[in-house]
A protein has these predicted regions:
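Charged, flexible cofactor/metal-binding loops and thiol motifs
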Residues: 9-12, 19, 255-376, 605-701
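P-loop NTP-binding/switch modules centered on Walker-like glycine-rich loops
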Residues: 60, 74, 198, 202-283, ...
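Helix-to-loop junction immediately C-terminal to a conserved catalytic motif
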Residues: 73, 77, 427
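ABC ATPase NBD coupling module
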Residues: 94-111, 137, 258-263, 295-301, ...
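Conserved ABC ATPase "signature" region
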Residues: 144-163, 272, 495-512, 621-622
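Conserved ABC ATPase signature
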Residues: 167-172, 176, 517-521, 525
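A short, proline-enriched helix->beta-strand linker immediately N-terminal to the Walker B motif
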Residues: 187-191, 536-540
Length: 701
């Protein structure tokens, strides 16, 4: 975090707003016209963002965060309108501007960076043309715009900017695309920069680089930032103040340090407790969850809007809407819309979806369940080479690992490290190179899924990152799960109905959704349907490929609890892929670290996190934002991009980016695995004791 705001910053008090403030919002109410009636999605929002300040806006999907951004830009859809209130940007009333003045303001005073840079960039235009357009809109000539484009690309730390200027968006990595979008947004030196989930989906190292870049540019340009995110750790790292939105209302606001250390609204407490923070593990505790769902847009609620989900609520809460209470805090005033804000931290812990005692979806335990610790899957010297336009790309290079019954193996690494390719090889969706060995229960596993028998097919299943792409939108939930039971368990009629009922109960999917189409479901419910399908055939191994990356923290917690429960009940093994290291730490028993297709480290989750680490693992861990992280010097910054798999570095594949490189030995010799004890192995030339000493010393990068 960039330090506390001035103590004179009264929370929720816009009366002291000045014309020099980047953003002032007073009594903002926004409605959407839905099915013939206006439905409020934002209600009486007031906040201010001072010049140069970073203000975070958090809350679950549907709380109104993005609507707040669109209203600020006056980009609401046709069915949206500002019903009441005022929005001032650098002293200008946005709603009062005519078309020309609004265009000028968007070109000079305010910019926005969206979640998906691939959709924000025009695929048919070069990077130079797109960034130059932003400068031209702010008044620069074409030649001057191109000169300033090159300067800005350097400023946002893009390597080889001359080459990038002639590139098209699809030729750049996600992190590079986001840097280009930031360059475009800052072309006009705006008073206010709105960031809407700018790092969602990015690797930990790329996310850290983007956040560092935003912080540095803020410092250089004095730009204020409205940072919208469901990632509380990112907000904690980036923002001086934070506002918590729930169902269109600002329920808490204050200095980020105060709100996260001593939250005064039960909703904020619930969000913070959902996080799989450092040290939390499925073997020690279940994650807290927030029961229930957001009220529908436009719902008329008497009393507190959060009362139906709050475990502190009483008759007063259901009867009387709480006013904004102002409380003196360490770094300025704190606001809470809760009658019992002093007791918010006393909120009883909740781990909804408490596991039932049943052992399986059927009447008995799964017939194939093996003794705990029995080896279920083995991969030995597995490689995969793709041939693209005559060039060989080594996506997975000589990887050996195994998986025990009831165990979770986490796979981590940057994009392009080979995680998903390795998982597809296990599933038979890709054929490995000659010499690769795959075994299930000690028996050879055919390379292609089409050559596997029914028992092998149903033993290995997958849950994808995006359930929308995995589920047929035209089918009902009952039909989707029923088809899986028919194909994987050969069940029909009454037997299928009985198993379906047990399966939906196992994944905590209410019966009222069985007739619904998936397009009518929330993200969390869709993922429960996907999990139910994967478990239809009583699989031995389930590959979970980023299953929670697109979910809110509250929904993520319930899905992680569900996966842990199913594993505990059935002895299912997981291969769990994620770029969120804290999620991986919570669910995994062991962790494997991949880089450029090579296995660099593998061991028990606690050992991999506590160290000693491979220098690459060390960099990944230092990049991951955490609310409870104790500072230990500067973050490790990896230089450059991941090398191409078509021309991997000689020697250690990580030596071109390694901050602890020894010299020629790393450049010329492939390092062996060294034993760190208790099944923890690291592929590095640096001796274990030296790694331990180096990584315990304070960093001053």
């Amino acid at each position: 975090m960039n330090g506390p705001p001035p103590a004179s910053f009264p929370a929720f008090d816009v009366s002291k707003s000045e014309r020099t403030d980047a953003l002032t919002v007073v009594g903002l109410t926004v409605t959407y016209r839905i099915r013939g009636r206006d439905r409020e999605v934002l209600h009486d929002i007031s906040l201010r963002v001072r010049r140069g300040e970073a203000y975070g806006l958090v809350g679950e999907s549907g709380c109104g965060k993005s609507t707040m951004a669109m209203a600020t830009l006056r980009y609401l859809p046709r069915n949206g309108k500002v019903k009441a209130g005022k929005i001032l940007i650098a002293g200008q009333d946005v709603q009062a501007l005519d078309a020309d003045a609004l265009r000028t303001m968007r070109a000079t005073a305010i910019s926005m960076v969206y979640q998906d840079p691939g959709r924000a960039l025009n695929p048919s235009m070069t990077i130079a043309r797109q960034v130059a357009e932003a400068f031209e809109a702010a008044g620069a000539t074409r030649s001057d715009a191109l000169t300033r484009t090159l300067e800005m690309l350097r400023r946002v730390r893009i390597a080889a900017p001359e080459r990038v200027m002639d590139s098209y968006p699809h030729q750049l990595s996600g992190g590079m695309q986001q840097r280009v979008v930031i360059a475009m947004a800052l072309a006009s030196n705006p008073a206010l920069l709105i960031l809407d989930e700018p790092t969602t989906g990015l690797d930990a190292t790329v996310e850290a680089e983007v956040l560092d870049l935003v912080a540095q540019l803020r410092k250089e340009l004095g730009t204020a930032v409205l940072f919208i995110s469901h990632n509380l750790a990112v907000i904690g790292r980036m923002c001086e103040r934070v506002g918590v939105l729930y169902a269109g209302k600002l329920v808490e606001e204050g200095a980020t340090q105060d709100v996260f250390a001593r939250p005064r609204h039960p909703y904020t407490v619930g969000l913070l407790r959902c996080l799989p923070t450092s040290g939390r593990s499925k073997t020690l505790e279940r994650l807290d969850t927030i029961a229930g769902q957001l009220p529908a847009p436009g719902s008329i609620t008497q009393g507190c809007i959060y009362a139906d989900r709050c475990r502190l609520a009483d008759d007063r809460c259901r009867r009387d809407a709480p006013p904004p209470h102002r409380v003196a805090a360490a770094h300025g005033d704190q606001m809470s819309r809760c009658h019992y804000h002093e007791r918010a931290m006393e909120l009883p812990r909740a781990t909804a979806d408490t596991p039932s005692p049943r052992a399986s979806v059927g009447d008995a335990a799964p017939a194939q369940a093996a003794a705990p610790g029995t080896l279920v899957l083995r991969a030995e010297r597995v490689s995969k080479t793709f041939h693209v336009s005559g060039v060989a790309l080594k996506a997975v290079d000589d990887v050996s690992l195994d998986l025990a019954t009831g165990e979770t193996l986490g796979l981590v690494g940057e994009s392009g490290s080979g995680k998903t390719t390795l998982a597809k090889l296990m599933l038979g969706l890709l054929s490995p190179d000659a010499g690769s060995i795959l075994e299930l229960d000690g028996m050879p596993l055919p390379a292609r899924v089409t050559r596997r028998n029914d028992e092998q097919v149903k033993s290995l299943q997958i849950v994808f990152q995006n359930p929308d792409s995995a589920l047929n939108r035209s089918h009902s939930v009952k039909r989707l799960i029923g088809r899986a039971l028919s194909r994987l368990a050969a069940l029909r009629g009454a037997a299928q109905d009985e198993r379906l009922a047990a399966l939906t109960a196992a994944v905590r999917l209410p019966n009222r959704y069985l007739g619904a189409r998936t397009r009518q479901l929330s993200g969390g419910l869709k993922q429960r349907v996907a999990i139910a399908r994967a478990f239809a055939g009583e699989p031995r191994v389930v590959v979970c490929d980023e299953p929670t990356s697109a979910l809110d923290v509250s929904v993520q917690a319930s899905i992680l609890n569900l996966l842990a429960d199913l594993q505990r009940e059935r002895g299912t093994s997981y291969v769990f892929i994620s770029h969120d290291l804290h999620v991986v730490r919570y669910l995994s028993d062991r962790i494997a670290v991949l880089y450029l297709g090579r296995l660099l480290e593998i061991g028990p989750a606690a050992a991999v996190f506590d160290g000693p680490h491979h220098p690459y693992t060390e960099a990944l861990l230092s990049s991951a934002p955490a609310l409870d992280a104790a500072p230990h010097g500067e973050r490790i910054r990896l230089s450059g991009e991941v090398p191409s798999a078509a021309a991997p570095p000689s020697g250690c594949v990580f030596h071109t980016r390694c901050p602890r490189k020894l010299g020629a030995v790393c450049e010329q010799q492939d390092p062996p695995f060294i034993d760190a004890g208790d099944g923890h192995r690291i592929r590095c030339h640096i001796p274990i004791q030296d790694l331990r000493t180096l990584q315990c010393a304070p960093r001053n990068a």
